[in-house]
Amino acid sequence: MDRIKIIGGNELRGTIPISGAKNAALPLMIAALLTDETLILDNVPRLADVALLQRILGNHGVDIMAAGKRPGDHEYQGQTLHISAKTIVDTTAPYDLVSKMRASFWVIAPLVARMHEAKVSLPGGCAIGTRPVDLLIMALEKLGAEITIDGGYVIAKAPGGLKGATIAFPKVTVSGTHVAVMAAALAKGTTIIDNAACEPEIVDVADCLNKMGAKITGAGTPRITIEGVAKLHGARHTVLPDRIETGTYAMAVAMAGGEVQLSGARPELLQAALDVLTQAGATITVNNDGIKVARNGAGISPVTVTTAPFPGFPTDLQAQLMALMTRAKGASHITETIFENRFMHVQELARFGAKISLDGETATIDGVERLRGAPVMATDLRASVSLVIAALAAEGETMVNRIYHLDRGFERLEEKLSACGANIERISG
């Protein structure tokens, strides 16, 4: 199993190109199931999760062709996928595939919308009553789908097609909003989604669906209106840049020191995180090519942050910020309001010598003068990259194990950091 070795102490200087957003690319690929024509997606990141979703879509009979780089593309230019769901041969998504990635459950929406039936395995590890899929099922039922759960599978049927409805989510849900928008695009009549998620990735998917002939307004606000259409057609769409990758590398620069241009980044996608970084002592400069992040000489200042849905501070940057705050001059406080059990990285950060205490959903980080390299283990995607950030400023060698988590969400992370001067390498085997 691959590992990443890091010897800390080097500043970061150079340019890091920002990849396409995983959290937009996955639902965009799934949306291709809504039409029998070809959807062309540009700037799709090369990630393990994208490759897995290609397998899942292939199971339904979807043909996917990955085009090579075009003249003038930079080294990390995202791939172009030509996705054709001309014929759907199977409306069942089996457990062995869905269990590996929760987002793959979303195929239920376009399948029941277009084929009027779907059988999709519950994602792995879902306890009855606290399942994240409950809100997704509620949305489909509001649109007229008949839902049964049998043998670990959700079976959705809509013999006469889906019908527009008002869907009021009891809490903001990104996955629920994606599912509701995709399903409603082909429903008969008007659908109104209240308390919709406002994330940029929701807007990106809605923009693509509108290019395909959907009639969606209000994406990016808490109320989305969808006028259903009978058929969607093919289109070409460029995946927006990854705001979580942008924030991650910005925090890496703030941790290690130096100055890095984040090429292609869009500051409006993560303003709350950039404001926190400025408060922590980083210098953020917006320019025509993206964002320049610098920390030259100044120490790291402590911050108090609460995660929140967009446009608040994203939960997907919480672990990275915690790593940065381990070196702050004073006590920082981070409260997690979006997900339970999202402090699994605390135990591993402690192996560097970090001082972190937990009280419910709030972590208090007492900054230390130095971190020391250590063997550490990645527990999930965002936690894994927080360990890399800590290692960049730690004395000595750090070995990060179980980096398959990293490969799910960060495209060639070690190459991008190495190009800016980090002493980092992937060790195979």
UniProtKB/Swiss-Prot annotation:
UDP-N-acetyl-alpha-D-glucosamine binds at residues 102, 131-135, 316, 338. It catalyses: phosphoenolpyruvate + UDP-N-acetyl-alpha-D-glucosamine = UDP-N-acetyl-3-O-(1-carboxyvinyl)-alpha-D-glucosamine + phosphate. It holds the Pfam family EPSP_synthase. The active site is at 126 (proton donor). The keyword Magnesium does not apply. One of its GO terms (molecular function) is UDP-N-acetylglucosamine 1-carboxyvinyltransferase activity. GO terms for biological process: cell division; cell wall organization; peptidoglycan biosynthetic process; regulation of cell shape; UDP-N-acetylgalactosamine biosynthetic process. This is UDP-N-acetylglucosamine 1-carboxyvinyltransferase. The lineage of its organism: Bacteria, Pseudomonadati, Pseudomonadota, Alphaproteobacteria, Hyphomicrobiales.
